[in-house]
Amino acid sequence: SRAEQSRALIKLLQYVYGYVRIPLGDIGSICMCKRILKSQTNTVSGVPFYKIGTFGKEADAYISQETFDEYRSRYNFPKKGDVLISAAGTIGRTVVYNGEPAYFQDSNIVWIDNDESIVLNSYLRFCYELKPWKASEGGTIPRLYNDNIAKAVIAIPSIEEQKRIVSILDRFDTICNDLTSGLPAEIEARQKQYEYYRDKLLSFKEHKDELYD
């Protein structure tokens, strides 16, 4: 199949060059949940419904268990470990879906249904921190369209190298989070150090020729 041929080509280029640069649209479909109407929500109880304003925070709206079960089975829904992306407001914020019952606002919160034999979700999360896309400016709210995400190019090394990079960045991440009670200057210095190594690890040397079309 075309997908199998694509995976084989990617792995060949990774073997030859160490990594391959490909657009996010080539590693999986960009997905979103089915639209939830305001009339389907309440502010008291049920399955948490996250809107762009509560993404990564506490939900202030809920949907019924029945609606959740129906929509999860009939329409797009993230898998545990998928990296959700904010497509409006503060562009590019990420939340790793933990598998707990929750529903997410359509179009404003999206994810890539990627093949983890090519790129790990944990690696993707760090790539998203670099914000490889270009947000469209229009109206009062900056908007990240599916096309912006699909055309964004990232460097993907072998799975083994992805795991190594993730392990290093996870350790830096933990150190930075453990410093929340430290001196502001120390916290800032650690954060800059983390960003420096993250950028170095995720920015591979470019080749003159295109590695992937």
Which residues does each predicted region cover?
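A short beta-sheet element
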Residues: K51, S73-E129
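Sequence-specific dsDNA recognition surfaces
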Residues: G25-S39, G53-K80
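Short, structured motif recognition centered on aromatic/hydrophobic residues
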Residues: Y19-L24, V47, P78, D82-L84, ...
